[in-house]
Amino acid sequence: MQVFYGLLLMFILCSTIHLSEQWCSTCLDLACGASRECYDPCFKAFGRAHGKCMNNKCRCYT
């Protein structure tokens, strides 16, 4: 039973790390002050003009 809980814990940790890597795949290393500044760079990078300025960096929604 302890082996099961150990494997479950490892699975949860690996899933969390994998999800955090996916979140940053849509972040652009571009300084911004407003969301409208992210529309053109997001369109050029991902083909969709869906973006938002978060923590002074552009985050694109694909």
UniProtKB/Swiss-Prot annotation:
SUPFAM superfamilies: Scorpion toxin-like. It comes from the Eukaryota. One of its GO terms (molecular function) is toxin activity. The record marks 52 as: Basic residue of the functional dyad. The record marks 61 as: Aromatic residue of the functional dyad. Residues 1-22 form the signal peptide. Keywords: Calcium-activated potassium channel impairing toxin, Disulfide bond, Ion channel impairing toxin, Neurotoxin, Potassium channel impairing toxin, Secreted, Signal, Toxin. It holds the Pfam family Toxin_2. GO terms for cellular component: extracellular region. Expressed by the venom gland. InterPro entries: Scorpion_toxin-like_sf, Scorpion_toxinS_K_inh. Disulfide bonds join 24-27, 32-53, 38-58, 42-60. PROSITE patterns: SCORP_SHORT_TOXIN. It is found in: Secreted. Has the structural arrangement of an alpha-helix connected to a beta-sheet by disulfide bonds (CSalpha/beta). The N-terminal C2-C5 disulfide bridge unique to this toxin does not appear to confer stability to the protein. Negative results: inhibits with a low efficiency Kv1.1/KCNA1, Kv1.5/KCNA5, Kv1.6/KCNA6, Kv4.3/KCND3, Kv7.1/KCNQ1, Kv7.2/KCNQ2, Kv7.4/KCNQ4, and ERG/KCNH2, and does not inhibit Kv1.4/KCNA4, Kv2.1/KCNB1, and Kv3.1/KCNC1. Potently blocks Kv1.3/KCNA3, Kv1.2/KCNA2, and Shaker potassium channels and inhibits high conductance calcium-activated potassium channels. Is potent against Kv1.3/KCNN3 (IC(50)=0.55 nM) and Kv1.2/KCNN2 (IC(50)=6.19 nM). It also stimulates the release of NO, IL-6 and TNF-alpha in J774.1 cells and presents a pro-inflammatory activity in mice. Belongs to the short scorpion toxin superfamily. Potassium channel inhibitor family. Alpha-KTx 12 subfamily. This is Potassium channel toxin alpha-KTx 12.1. It comes from Tityus serrulatus.
